[in-house]
Amino acid sequence: MPLFWKAVSILELTCNLPVIVTVSDGASANRKFYRMHAAMDNNAGKAVVYRTMNVYAPDRYIWLFADVPHLMKTARNCLYHSSIGASTRCMWNDGKYLLWQHICKIVNDDAENGLKLCPKLSNEHTQLTAYSVMNVRLAAQALSETTSKILKEYYPPDTHGTAEFCLQLDTFFDALNVRSRREAEFKRKDALKPYTSIDDERLQWLENTFLKYLEDWKKSIVDRPGEFSKTDRQKMFLSLQTYEGLQMTANSVIEVTKFLLSKGMMAFVLTNRFNQDVVEEYFGR
């Protein structure tokens, strides 16, 4: 019996604890394990496997999540390595390039001016080290709504692809980072309110806007005219690990939130709980 299912059996049968979600990083072994359960997702019809029937409670699924802080870092890393020329990636979407130099330009311009457009961004965000590349805060601040607004308002249209990417990732992170019942009130940010309704507009945004953004981006690369090799086209997009993780997590949070609210199991849902911080803190002692 696989170790995963042995753990589920102990929790379900011995401890009487329903297993609803499992979270992991995007390691190839984890993604391969999830794909092995494609026949157990009850024909979800999605591009990735994001749920599996719970063999110890067949009336329930176990939803599969990629760790959201990890996804933010890998998405930022994709943009960090994206530039025109000799680089590992040159991201492109519907006629616009998504380049790290666009964010660097904000930081450099702010350094030359007396008044900063984006006080939170600094060289620490753009000149990554072995330590800073692991910092979730730096990734989230670089791919923020503020960065998006600055690019759209003060910089040329050729930066707007990067701006839209930042906006999409920032909204995704907010939707998956609801931590308490009061944080939205303290920060005056409705995106951080607890989920209390299956018709929450954030769930609709994930399904109708965010997932469509990724799908349209990929399609624009496939349809891009020109003699590009398969490798060249892969460089225009996110890494496979990041793309599958975003799809899997978005689909999972939509369904599991509706499940928990509709079954009366929870009065509200805090999506920040769907990460592996607790495990990392425990084993990091």
Name what the model sees in each region.
Residues M1-R285:
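Non-catalytic regulatory appendages
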